[in-house]
Amino acid sequence: MPRSFLVKSKKTHTYNQHRYVEEQPVTGVDLVATVYHAHCTECPAEFPAFSTDPTEKQHTPENVITEEARSDPGDPREKIPFLSRSISPNSFQGIALSSMRPLKHYDPSPLSAFYTQNFSWDALHSTYGFKQIPSHIHPSMLQNSINLYSCPPRVDSDSDHPINYSMSYSPKMDTYHCVKCSKVFSTSHGLEVHVRRSHSGTRPFVCNICGKSFGHAVSLEQHLNVHSQERSFECKMCGKTFKRSSTLSTHLLIHSDTRPYPCQFCGKRFHQKSDMKKHTYIHTGEKPHKCQVCGKAFSQSSNLITHSRKHTGFKPFSCDLCCKGFQRKVDLRRHRENQHGLK
């Protein structure tokens, strides 16, 4: 028997030996080739169903055992997700994730012969287009939180631990979403700080002047500027001063004519998101602010505040010339123009 034939025969019968991680990492194609075998009816040879080895091509398709004859309900190979015996070498790399049916509860035990602790799934991830999870995410945040198949996560709304609010982490956008208020954060730390300040229910920092409580010392410090007359934030363009830096930042949008918030109904743009939201009530007809005395509803909270003064009789705007009081600032301005000739 020629030596070349013996080499090819040895190669044929040693090709499908299981290769473990200690020798070499198994790739996606090798995994399928290892799991799915075809047997020749003329000789004891066993080889991958879609093997491209020249020696194995000598076995004609008629001699390969069919899938129906090979299938066994108790065969562990039937439990492996996403794989099909009809896979060909050319079509394997182009398999779409949408055409695969994932198992709800995947049991890795059928793969015990091919999987070890150090097994690398990178090849399968790239082959099937799995969502890549950034390496800097701590494993504790991924547990019961990330779903590789984009299924909505089940969130325990009664849990107070801040980390539970990271369950809507989006690997594709690399962002973290608060499930309470839908705010988006770029880091897990930012989300945790937000939950601790806004949703934990604890406000240990109390204002000694008005009694309002806050969840963080910085918020209390910013609030104290409201009670003081100091306006330390000045606009360099018009000289107007403000008590808060955030108010100054909003004011600067007027000079730059930046209106980043458009109305989704009419396209009108606004400087602030709150103004845009109030404007949308005109299109939707929504009136979320209701008077507790007479039941009248308003689309804007400022209109409700002005309306409530009719029930209380409160007149915060007074004329400095005749001391007459008014419930609205616009009424005071008209009074000064009509009665005192001032503008």
From Swiss-Prot:
Q: Which is one Pfam family of this protein?
A: zf-C2H2
Question: Which residue ranges does the record annotate as region Mediates repression of transcription?
Answer: 1-20
* Signal peptide start and end residues: none
Record key words, sorted: Chromatin regulator, Developmental protein, DNA-binding, Metal-binding, Nucleus, Repeat, Transcription, Transcription regulation, Zinc, Zinc-finger
- Quick one: a GO cellular component term? nucleus
Transmembrane region(s): none
Q: Which GO terms describe its biological process?
A: chromatin organization; regulation of transcription by RNA polymerase II
Q: SUPFAM superfamilies per the record?
A: beta-beta-alpha zinc fingers (SSF57667)
Q: Which parts of this chain are annotated as the region Disordered?
A: 51-77
Q: Could you tell me where the Basic and acidic residues compositional bias lies?
A: 67-77
**Disulfide bond annotation, renumbered to this chain:** none
* Main localisation: nucleus
Stretch list, region SNAG domain: 1-20
Cellular localization per UniProt:
Nucleus
Question: Which InterPro entries did the record assign?
Answer: Znf_C2H2_sf (IPR036236), Znf_C2H2_type (IPR013087)
Q: What does this protein do?
A: Essential transcriptional regulator necessary for development and differentiation of erythroid and megakaryocytic lineages. Alters histone methylation by recruiting histone methyltransferase to target genes promoters. Plays a role in heterochromatin formation.
Q: What is known of its domains?
A: The zinc finger domain is essential for erythroid expansion and acts as an activation domain whereas non finger domain serves as repression domain.
Name the chain's protein.
Zinc finger protein Gfi-1b
- Annotated organism of origin: Xenopus laevis (African clawed frog)
